[in-house]
Structures are given as structure tokens and as C-alpha cells.
């Protein structure tokens, strides 16, 4: 900043903050929303550790694409480990009137995807996985490979610590992550932990969530807003 900004700008806190914000905007990559094209099926999977809000985020995305964008949407869940996880997603599917497939093993994935073949967008919910559990990460990799996912978004809680975020993103990179979704912005006091995450992972941020309300509490990520949250 000292190299780029004149002294009078550095002396003014507001001008200095604005300069820092513009620099941060260039350092925080955003990926834009999911693009679902009518008649061309797109399969998007959400992955991540436990408790970050993957299922609720799936419901928000599904409701927005179905009710607001009038896309033909289907759901797949492979989260058969967590108690009531399937029922939670099925409740959303019933409310929004979406077809849903439950997949218990990777070998069932292709037939489930075929049954949803005529849709514009398929959203795939996965079980939360510890980044330290290599066996479960490998199993997740098998599910995604069989699904032939077009996009894999890593869902992370914005209230997690810097080291945990960086470590989690590094471990999930092996499943082919293409973007990130940050959840629980309503619980975060700042996003200072974001810069090390994006610098190490190099993943663009696609969406932000800031509450539990379906379908309202989700927004497309914008670099300017993220820069302001970091500051």
C-alpha cells in the first residue's frame, strides 16, 4: 500500500481504508452463481466438514432455482450416516415439489443420476466429513467420480478459525473442489480468516449464507462485499 498510495492518502484513515478495500477486492476471487441451462443437465455437489450447513444451503439453492428461476431441479443425497439427514432434505423436496434420490453407495450413483436425467440442475448433498479422515474422504471421492459432478463446492463456516479453514480446504482439494460457499456470516464478527484461505486454496467463492431462512438467506458472492467484511 505504501508503494502505491500517496502520503496524503495514507494519512487519511478513510482514504487508506478505501485503498485497502480496493486491493482486497483484487485478491478475493469470486466464481459467480451456478449457471443452469434449460435442457442441459448440470450436477453440482456440496461437500465439507460436519455442521457447516450443507443441507440447508442445498435447500436454499434448490428453492431459488426452482421457484425464482423456474428451472427443473432434482436432489440427490448420499448423507445416509447422519440421523434424520435424509428426512430433512426430503421435507424440503416435498415443500418445493422436487424429485429426490437417496444413494447409499457409489455403485448406486449412476442409476440415480440417470433417473434425474431430464432435469436442468441436480444438487447433490453429501455427508459431513472430517478433513483428517482419509478413508471417508476417499469414499466421498468415489461418490463424486460416479456422479460425474460438473461442480464441487466446498462449504465452510465463516466462524471457523484460520488454521482450520486452510487445513480443511487443503484436504478436500483431493475430491476436485471447484469453488467455495461461506456459511454463517450472521454469526461472524469479521472475515479476517478469509485471506489466508483464498490465498492457499485459490478457490473462488460462489455464495454466502447469512441465516437459516429458506430460500432468502443466501447471496451470490461479490468481491466488494467480501472486502468490506474482511475490513
Task: Give the positions of each predicted feature.
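Generic detector of well-ordered alpha-helical packing
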Residues: 78-80, 126, 184
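A short, aliphatic-rich alpha-helical micro-motif
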Residues: 38, 116-117
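Glycine-rich beta-strand-to-loop/alpha-helix junction loops that act as flexible
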Residues: 47-48, 125-127
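Primarily NTPase-proximal linker/entry elements flanking Walker-type ATP/GTP-binding cores
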Residues: 1-52, 56-73, 77-80, 91-105, ...
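Conserved catalytic-core segment of NTP-binding enzymes
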Residues: 74, 85-88, 95, 104-115, ...
Amino acid at each position: 500500500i505504501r508503494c502505491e498510495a500517496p502520503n496524503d492518502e495514507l494519512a487519511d484513515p478513510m482514504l487508506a481504508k478505501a485503498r485497502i478495500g480496493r486491493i482486497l477486492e483484487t485478491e478475493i476471487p469470486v466464481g459467480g452463481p451456478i449457471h443452469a441451462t434449460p435442457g442441459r443437465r448440470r450436477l453440482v455437489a456440496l461437500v465439507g466438514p460436519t455442521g457447516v450447513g450443507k443441507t440447508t444451503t442445498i435447500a436454499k439453492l434448490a428453492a431459488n432455482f426452482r421457484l425464482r428461476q423456474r428451472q427443473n431441479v432434482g436432489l440427490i443425497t448420499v448423507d445416509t450416516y447422519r440421523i434424520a439427514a435424509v428426512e430433512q432434505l426430503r421435507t424440503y423436496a416435498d415443500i418445493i415439489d422436487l424429485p429426490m434420490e437417496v444413494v447409499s453407495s457409489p455403485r448406486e450413483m449412476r442409476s440415480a443420476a440417470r433417473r434425474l436425467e431430464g432435469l436442468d440442475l441436480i444438487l447433490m448433498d453429501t455427508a459431513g466429513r472430517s478433513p483428517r479422515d482419509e478413508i471417508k474422504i476417499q469414499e466421498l471421492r468415489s461418490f463424486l467420480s460416479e456422479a460425474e459432478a460438473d461442480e464441487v463446492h466446498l462449504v465452510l463456516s465463516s466462524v471457523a478459525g484460520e488454521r482450520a479453514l486452510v487445513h480443511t480446504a487443503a484436504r478436500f482439494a483431493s475430491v476436485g473442489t471447484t469453488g467455495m460457499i461461506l456459511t454463517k456470516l450472521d454469526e461472524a464478527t469479521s472475515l479476517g480468516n478469509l485471506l489466508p484461505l483464498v490465498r492457499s486454496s485459490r478457490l473462488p467463492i460462489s455464495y454466502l449464507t447469512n441465516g437459516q431462512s429458506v430460500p432468502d438467506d443466501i447471496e451470490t458472492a461479490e468481491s466488494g462485499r467480501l472486502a468490506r467484511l474482511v475490513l
